């Protein structure tokens, strides 16, 4: 992918946007101070971002939403309320909403051996007697691992991919006993969903989740209308897509979704694809494109006990199952990989964050935000979806690329990055009691 050079018109657009961002008040805006604070973070020479889209909810209502930076740097196009992002692993939470809809319809059972859905045996070779369930897959306790890959093309079935077991299983921990975050879990989940519904994953999620909640976007950009795919944010890093040094003072380089002037290309041979063969094709793990505003609709539904627009989308019982911890870290006898303290409790497709100040997954410096949700990171994007169901508060953060390598800018008070900490701590002012 070519370097994205910032020409003079684009540079002028960036400067104009910095001013415009502060003069575009959102719902119940808490004042221009937060606008200026977030604009300064976005344009910081070290922590700076290609684009930023945020939304906060307070007491069950949208309190603040704003966009900063450019969705397409080369074309000089600003991020807008309609701009969609490839939200990375927050997609897993949305995929889980689809799973729970199928559970409520009686098509899936969280505790049945998933082999019965897949049509082939899904077993850890080290523990062949132990069935694997959807509950294990959704809570990352299945013993699946990503070392052998977690995404394959249309021409490869999941059955074929799983025949080579190297790197795909944990030989030391029995399924259900140990947590280790793995994308492959949700590739299997997507395949199961297709198998029981007889429908391609992208279309199934449109029918189960996106259409009922009146959301734009989807898991397949090539199927979107022009007005949607042209508003997908290009994701950037200040390094080549696959290798090379990360230089904060250099040009932004497009990584994925460079659709400002070129339409998304349909997946090769997709018309011959058989649903249930390989759900990884549409990336249930991270491939959803959606705006912060539409993620806000999902969050409001979850804060309203599964109701949206006066109708039931999910039952309160289903949401409780999703958010209730299925796994908790036990320091006395380690039962999971916490990823440097970031993961300590998981439900089904939902993480429980620490509310105490100074803990690994604490989202704000002051502590006190008792939240559940999901994080995401891929191709330069950093994303946060977090809500407090008791106080009915929440925050959504979509960062379209960071000037510095996040690995070199670790957080000061958590296992998050410094970029995420800066935005979350500032945004929390719009939801804090």
Question: Each predicted region: which residue ranges?
Answer:
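Bacterial N-terminal signal peptides that target proteins for export
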Residues: 2-11
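Sec-dependent N-terminal signal peptides
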Residues: 12-17
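C-terminal motif of bacterial Sec signal peptides marking the signal peptidase cleavage site
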Residues: 20-21
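Short, conserved catalytic-motif segment at the N-terminal edge
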Residues: 31-85, 159-160, 166-168
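Short active-site loop at a secondary-structure junction
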Residues: 45-53, 74-136, 171-184, 283-286, ...
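Short, surface-exposed loop or secondary-structure junction motifs
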Residues: 125-369
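Short, gly/Ser/Thr-rich active-site loops of penicillin-recognizing serine hydrolases
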Residues: 323-335, 355, 365-367, 400-433
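Short, well-ordered beta-strand elements
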Residues: 382-387, 392-408
